């Protein structure tokens, strides 16, 4: 049998000639493209059958509880702690890597210096916070790493020179991240 592409194409044309018009071929092609677009826009949970919500049932009751969201870990919020003392040292840490943060060390009368992470100098200037050099300060802060010896306290607010400087919210998140 002699196999030549032009003869195969001619046979196919002869078989479909008259059965399909150019408009019907375009219509079928357009419908297929539309179906593919609709399938691509459907959420994965419909196309993969993953739309079921996971629940957990406690052993003592038949009440369904929602499953924990992926990526979240339970934690115990840090309790606010009060601090006060005279500033013995002021340093800006992290300027060389782009996130400069003012830290102060205070003598709180216990014989050991306490390190307090304050805020970037640019934020302190923006809110009009006075200089810490040699000042007597007091405030509220969070100790996030209580297990580490000499862990720094993250100041929520500091009273310095008669002015209260608000630095973090109740969860310890930096207020300078939201200032325009």
UniProtKB/Swiss-Prot annotation:
It is found in: Magnetosome membrane. GO terms for cellular component: magnetosome membrane. The keyword Glycoprotein does not apply. It is a single-pass membrane protein. Residues 1-21 are cytoplasmic. Keywords: Biomineralization, Magnetosome, Membrane, Transmembrane, Transmembrane helix. Disruption phenotype: Normal magnetic response, smaller, widely spaced magnetosomes. Near wild-type localization of MamC. Deletion of approximately 80 kb of DNA, including this operon, leads to cells that are non-magnetic, lack internal membrane systems, grow poorly, have reduced mobility and take-up and accumulate iron poorly. The keyword rRNA-binding does not apply. Induction: Part of the probable 17 gene mamAB operon. Residues 43-180 are lumenal. The chain crosses the membrane at residues 22-42. Belongs to the magnetosome MamS family. May play a role in magnetite crystal growth and size. This bacteria makes up to 60 cubo-octahedral magnetosomes of about 45 nm in diameter which contain membrane-bound crystals of magnetite (Fe(3)O(4)). NCBIfam families: MamS. This is Magnetosome protein MamS.
């Amino acid at each position: 049998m002699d196999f030549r592409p032009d003869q195969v194409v001619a046979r196919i044309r002869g078989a479909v000639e008259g059965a399909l018009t150019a408009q019907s071929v375009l219509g079928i092609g357009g419908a297929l493209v539309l179906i593919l677009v609709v399938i691509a826009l459907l959420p994965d949970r419909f196309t993969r059958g993953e739309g079921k919500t996971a629940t957990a049932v406690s052993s003592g009751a038949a009440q369904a509880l929602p499953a924990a969201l992926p990526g979240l870990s339970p934690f115990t919020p840090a309790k606010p702690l009060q601090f006060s003392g005279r500033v013995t040292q002021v340093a800006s840490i992290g300027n060389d890597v782009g996130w400069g943060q003012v830290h102060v060390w205070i003598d709180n009368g216990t014989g050991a210096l306490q390190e307090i992470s304050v805020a970037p100098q640019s934020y302190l200037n923006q809110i009009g916070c006075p200089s810490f050099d040699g000042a007597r300060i007091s405030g509220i802060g969070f100790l996030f790493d209580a297990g580490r010896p000499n862990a720094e306290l993250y100041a929520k607010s500091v009273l310095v020179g008669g002015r209260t400087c608000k630095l973090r919210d109740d969860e310890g998140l930096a207020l300078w991240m939201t200032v325009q």
